UniProtKB/Swiss-Prot annotation:
The lineage of its organism: Bacteria, Pseudomonadati, Pseudomonadota, Gammaproteobacteria, Enterobacterales. This is Putative glutamate--cysteine ligase 2. It holds the Pfam family GCS2. It is an enzyme of class 6 (ligase). The keyword Nucleotide-binding applies. It comes from Enterobacter sp. (strain 638).
Length: 373
């Protein structure tokens, strides 16, 4: 299918997608009941969307086009209430987090969807292993060239977004030693990681045309880069975050991304070049492995600092943009999190260290999602 023209969007409009865990108490393993839950709530959703993801244990919620994080929060809050009512009727529960700590991928069932079944045939067990849960944030752009500039600009802060959202230290019943183990699941896919280098939209059109020669890429949905342009929406989509444990934290992360996008496209602080990506995988690994304590290495100077230190610098830079966009509260909440020094991944490990079980950890996450907006 040919790549569509880039749809011009109002700059800095916002859309958020969250992949949630559908959980079956009292054992708190993943359920296979998302289809029944979606059927029960779809007529109650007035703004945004509730839909399938890859397997029957995954529930995706997505806002519509929002001007600011307050609009997104209101839409998610309404969805949350509808989902909790239906889940209660069906005796299932909902949790955030980038991975379920002890589910087995062999037990997962792919949704009855033509695209997902095609991917199961193509990728085999990799699709079932991709029963992991992420947050995606779309930011509107005026044109394709702006989208490519923004994509490269946001790529500089991929470690920050990973570390800020990291909530997947446990997988398959084990402590992975990673703050975010979720992203490792995608390493077997041919389109994992950063987008190949292009400098403008014309270059991207050529890139997509060549990718389509493989017969594995038909639409932009078939590429799973860390950040990708979405021409049909007129957005740039950031895809590296674990799903946070609360809607509030997800909203704050989206607010940071929106403010960073505004700063990047308004100030144009960087002249992007291909060598900017030479240490991309190393810095990304540091974020996945160590979270906010990970070390960033500057590709030009070799200077190193922790992600937490550099995050404080970023918050200062984007604060005026956040103020203009109505997202100052997100910056303040993230600054408070940095001051407290505890990520969601660390709080999970603390819970287990204090004698909690993985089952009780999932139970706690379900309670957290149900009681926090």
């Amino acid at each position: 299918m040919p790549l569509p023209d880039f749809h011009s969007s109002d700059p800095f409009t916002l859309g958020i997608e969250l992949e949630l865990q559908v959980v079956n108490p009292p054992g708190y393993d993943l359920s296979q009941d998302s289809s029944a839950l979606i059927a029960a709530v779809k007529n109650d959703i007035k703004a945004g969307e509730v839909k399938h993801d890859i397997t029957e244990s995954m529930l995706e919620i997505a806002t519509g086009v929002c001007q600011n994080i307050d609009q997104a929060a209101a839409q998610f809050s309404a969805m949350q209430q509808a989902i909790l009512r239906a889940a209660g009727d069906q005796h299932i529960q909902i949790a955030g987090g980038g991975t379920h700590p002890f589910q087995k991928w062999q037990r997962q069932e792919v949704c009855d969807d033509e695209r997902y079944n095609h991917n199961l045939e193509l990728f085999g067990y990799l699709i079932l292993q991709a029963t992991v849960f992420g947050q995606h944030v779309h930011v509107g752009c005026r044109n394709g060239d702006d989208a490519i500039y923004l994509l490269h600009g946001l790529s500089r802060f991929v470690p920050h977004f990973i570390a800020l959202s990291a909530s997947s230290p446990y997988m398959q019943g084990s402590d992975t030693k990673f703050a975010s183990s979720r992203l490792n699941i995608f390493s077997g896919f041919p389109d994992n990681g950063k987008m190949p280098w292009v400098s403008n939209w014309q270059g991207f059109e050529g890139l997509f045309r060549r990718l389509s020669y493989t017969s594995m890429i038909d639409t932009i949905k078939d590429v799973h880069w860390d950040i990708r342009p979405s021409p049909h929406f007129g957005t740039v989509e950031v895809r590296v975050m674990d799903t946070p444990l609360t809607l509030a934290h997800a909203i704050n992360i989206a607010g940071l991304i929106q403010a960073t996008a505004h700063w990047l496209l308004t100030e144009r602080p960087y002249k992007h070049q291909e060598q900017d990506y030479l240490l991309y995988k190393f810095n990304r690994f540091q974020a996945c492995r160590y979270g906010l304590d990970g070390l960033l290495t500057d590709v030009n100077t070799g200077e190193q600092k922790t992600i937490a230190e550099d995050m404080k610098w970023l918050l200062d830079r984007v604060a005026p943009s956040a103020e203009k966009l109505g997202g100052a509260s997100a910056i303040a909440e993230i600054a408070l999190m940095l001051k407290q020094g505890k990520s969601e991944a660390q709080r999970m490990r603390d819970f287990i260290a204090d004698g909690g079980s993985l089952i009780s950890l999932v139970q706690k996450h379900c309670e957290l999602w149900a009681t926090h907006p």
